[in-house]
Amino acid sequence: PPDGAEQQFNDWYNNHHMPSHVYGVSGFRSGQRYKIPDRPDYLAIYDLASSETLTDEEYRDRKYRPDAPTKKMLSEVIAFTRYVADEISFQVRDGLTIDDAFDAGMILAAFFTVPDDAVVEFIDWYETEHTPMLLANPGWRMARHMRIVDADPNPFTHMMLHYIDGEHVLDSDAV
């Protein structure tokens, strides 16, 4: 958010952006937003029916012809980064539902640049070795693996979203 305008940004985001630009556009299944502790920085995750949702006329109209409140707010936002990704897989810790996993207290995003000739091996390692090791930790709820298809800036090929109970989980011996 703009300096000194975090409350104004949150009002716009919660009461204008989410209802009209997320829930109001077909193809958007859900939207969650997470705040970085002690900083006015946020991570927003929008689950789409597919990345094709972003080429739909309804979405493009709202993105490229924003209404006045959106145009004003976006002109003041700095350090905006956007990744569009297709989900490769997700794994939920045994005994939890997906809804339980989404109720995590913290999201950890990890980004990788994987060379084309190593993608198959990387995916196999991530899904059969690394993720099960993480999910053995009781505070690790879910891991989502995504292939980045569009980014600004564009340094990464894969993104992982880890749904965990809190920062204390990162201190576990299992991690």
Predicted regions and their residues:
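Macromolecular interaction modules
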Residues: 1-175
